[in-house]
Amino acid sequence: MTLGYLYSKFFKRVLRGNSILNSVIAKTAKVYSGSTFYDSKLGRYSYVGYDSEVINCEIGAFCSIANGFITGGAKHPLDWVSTSPVFYNVGSGTGHHLGNLPIEKTAKTIIGNDVCIGSRAIIMQGVNVGTGAAIGAGAVVTKDVPPYAVVAGCPAKIIKYRFNDDIINKLLKSQWWLMDDKILKSIARYVNTPELFLSELEKIKSNVGGGKYKELNASRFFFFATSNSYCDRRMAA
């Protein structure tokens, strides 16, 4: 845990800002106040609600994350004599150290595209959440979540899938979340009917020939946030 991270916690709690550090945020994405967003990425049109803590996590496009979400927190060594961080080489909760033992870095959490996460849900570090999944409020997710699965509970379990296998496979194959805004605007009225949406999408792909519809150049949609103030710069290609 670095000095910058500890500063970001102070900024969030005392000044009620949204503390963003060493992260990449899409220009059309948003992290709400009271939240810590550290060593992470947030895709276009995604948002993270108030009072959330996101550490070492990659979040795709079009994700809706409610207030109080937590992922990527510190992992304490359960097989050591003590779980206290005063004995290893990260920031200590007390500000004091009795040792400097190395400890394995927390695994990165991956959240796909168009994922919906309910209020105060927790996703354990290193978990992969598939595109289109929905996480219930207060859920504790300890295992990978398949695409378009709906999970809830503690520990979270699969309740159902949002669509049948055919629709899920077609949506995943379409990768609609990579499309240019102009294309998405032209078919936005079909979002509430998956079959029509996919049908119209196929027409668009056919009209431009060979299915080579325009996809996004990610460098157009991101800026770096390397401190508590935004820095409007494009990503390297």
Predicted regions and their residues:
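Membrane-proximal basic amphipathic "stem/tether" segments
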Residues: M1-A26, A237
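Conserved catalytic-core motifs of eukaryotic protein kinase domains, centered on the activation segment
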Residues: K75-P77, V145, Y161-R162
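HATPase_c (GHKL) ATP-binding subdomain of two-component histidine kinases
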Residues: I117, K143, A152
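Conserved G/P- and acidic residue-centered "switch" motifs that form tight phosphate/ATP-binding loops
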Residues: I135, G153
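Conserved catalytic segment of ABC-fold P-loop ATPases
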Residues: G130-A133, P146-Y148
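C-terminal segments of enzyme domains that contribute to small-molecule binding surfaces
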Residues: V14, S84-I123, P155-A237
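Flexible, glycine/small-residue-enriched loop-and-beta-strand segment within the central core
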Residues: F10, V14-L15, K30, F37-G43, ...
